[in-house]
Swiss-Prot record:
GO MF entries: alpha-1,4-glucan glucosyltransferase (ADP-glucose donor) activity; alpha-1,4-glucan glucosyltransferase (UDP-glucose donor) activity
SUPFAM superfamilies linked: UDP-Glycosyltransferase/glycogen phosphorylase
Enzyme Commission identifier(s): 2.4.1.21
Entries under Pfam families matching the protein: Glyco_transf_5, Glycos_transf_1
Name the record gives this protein: Glycogen synthase
Keyword tags: Glycogen biosynthesis, Glycosyltransferase, Transferase
Similarity annotation: Belongs to the glycosyltransferase 1 family. Bacterial/plant glycogen synthase subfamily.
Chain positions recorded as ADP-alpha-D-glucose binding sites: K15
Pathway where it operates: Glycan biosynthesis; glycogen biosynthesis
BP GO annotations: glycogen biosynthetic process
């Protein structure tokens, strides 16, 4: 079986969020299952020179973008057994950031078209094209409407994964004819029209053979008005083609036994060495090196989605507890300013790093006792799984993948691997933090919690098997349709 991942970012080459981690880890795991999984992404300016040196040009062609004819180079690189194809066009991709440009609609209209145009040139004919988020949303739609009649494409199936339904790729109506070579009949409710705009995300939801989300709970949530971002009706209509498959983490990269970024590596059998990382973390943030004071951490995008309004609401009440707090992240200016001010207001209790720093993030996962994720919504979330892998106990709101991966500790049955609260309410969060702190002060309970956390399986193995089954059923379904018509 052959599968092509069409993505807008992929670790370790280009990353702005969790999508890159998925695109970097899942194809590797699928290859271990015997699937020829390859990845296609733009060749961004920001890709490190050491990767660019390893690329070799395998094709050149012209890609139509409306009436324009744009150059397309294809460069190939092999890494960890996976073949990556980079779509090269300096006009579109020689930019300082991956996204956020005035012409993102044109950039990704070009990329979606290039994905399909390139395949015959590189002589790769996938059984399944697996697209991710709005940036590649037009691939399934263009395949269905403009390419499916050609012999080369006739048997190709499409899977579309929703990583975050909030970002939909909305553009003016004129993009249809001008950039996508689609006429006005496609600007209807049952095609691409979405409240007066063209929606790339909707194109994928309408045309893909299978739709997946990144956790079972998020799959259910997005079929409701509260989480559905005005697409819940369409998703309910396609519920028979909708799957929720939990993301995993790259357990080779996030491995406390061999992590090069840690002060001290450790395993489930040498958990006492975790304390060395805690002291190093306290030292790094200028906090007193107290072993018996619980250290809570957040590694987060500083946005309202991540529940930071809850934290700002009860911050001073949190600070009345005997605890320390470390925060790493960047995002909305108001949150950056708030946490910077709190670090100054509570010296010795609060440490803040504005920005993202991979080695420091690993040190935080290893050095903290508790990890706070109070998200408004969270399609999957990787942070809670990374924290669990490092024996750092998560405090989460019960939404999306957080609900699927963190089971709240039950003092009667002694089951659970973290702490959780249901309502998006600051004092519910505060109560849960206080509950977690009370169990931190019970060493026998805490030992059980950290051991259970570290023994959990958060890898891609289970998820990769589910994707393999989904691909196989899709191909089988198509063969059945062809035979029985």
């Amino acid at each position: 079986m052959k599968v092509l991942f069409a993505v807008s970012e992929c670790a370790p080459f280009a990353k702005s969020g969790g999508l890159a981690d998925v695109a970097g880890a899942l194809p590797k795991e699928l290859r271990r299952l015997g699937i020829d999984a390859r990845v296609m992404l733009p060749k961004y300016e920001t890709i490190a020179p050491e990767w660019k040196k390893k690329m070799k040009k395998v094709a050149e062609l012209i890609v139509p973008v409306g009436w324009r004819r744009q150059y397309c180079g294809v460069e190939e690189l092999r890494h960890d057994g996976v073949i990556y194809y980079f779509i090269d066009n300096e006009y579109y991709f020689k930019r300082p950031q991956l996204y956020g440009h005035y012409d993102d609609g044109e950039r990704f209209a070009y990329f979606c078209r290039a994905v399909l145009e390139v395949l015959p040139e590189i002589q790769f004919q996938p059984d399944v094209i697996h697209c991710h988020d709005w940036h590649t949303g037009m691939v399934p739609f263009l395949l269905r409407e403009q390419y499916r009649h050609e012999l080369f494409y006739v048997d190709m199936r499409t899977v579309f994964t929703i990583h975050n339904l909030q970002f939909q790729g909305l553009f003016p109506r004129g993009i249809l004819e001008d950039l996508l070579n689609l006429d006005g009949r496609y600007f209807t409710v049952d095609h691409l029209e979405f409240y007066g705009c063209v929606s790339f995300m909707k194109g994928a939801l309408v045309a893909s053979d299978l739709i997946t989300t990144v956790s079972p709970t998020y799959k259910e949530e997005i079929q409701t008005a509260y989480y559905g971002e005005r697409l819940d009706g369409l998703l309910r209509a396609r519920r028979d083609d909708l799957l929720g498959i939990l993301n995993g983490i790259d357990d080779e990269f996030y491995n406390p036994e061999a992590d090069p970024f840690l002060t001290a590596t450790y395993s489930v059998h040498t958990r006492e060495r975790k304390q060395l990382n805690k002291r190093a973390l306290q030292r790094q943030f200028g906090l007193p090196e107290w072993d018996d004071v619980p250290l809570i951490a957040m590694v987060t995008r500083m946005t309202a989605q991540k529940g930071l309004d809850l934290v700002t609401c009860v911050f001073h009440e949190m600070m009345s507890e005997d605890m320390q707090l470390v925060v790493l992240g960047t995002g909305d200016w108001r949150f950056e300013q708030f946490f910077s001010q709190m670090a100054a207001a509570y010296p010795g209790k609060v440490g803040v790093y504005i920005g993202f720093h991979e080695p420091l993030a690993h040190q935080i996962y290893a050095g903290a006792d508790l990890f706070l994720i109070p998200s408004l919504f969270e399609p999957c979330g990787l942070s809670q799984m990374i924290a669990l892998r490092y024996g750092t106990i998560p405090i989460v709101r019960e939404t999306g993948g957080l609900n699927d991966t963190v089971q709240s500790y039950n003092e009667i049955t002694k089951e659970g691997n973290g702490f959780s609260f249901t309502n998006f309410n600051a004092h519910d969060m505060l109560y849960t933090i206080r509950r977690a702190l009370s169990f931190y002060r019970q060493p026998s309970v805490w030992e059980q919690l950290t051991e259970r956390a570290m023994r959990g399986d958060y890898s891609w193995r289970r998820s990769a098997n589910q994707y393999k089954q989904a691909y196989e059923q899709l191909i089988k379904k198509e063969e059945h349709t062809l035979v029985h018509g």
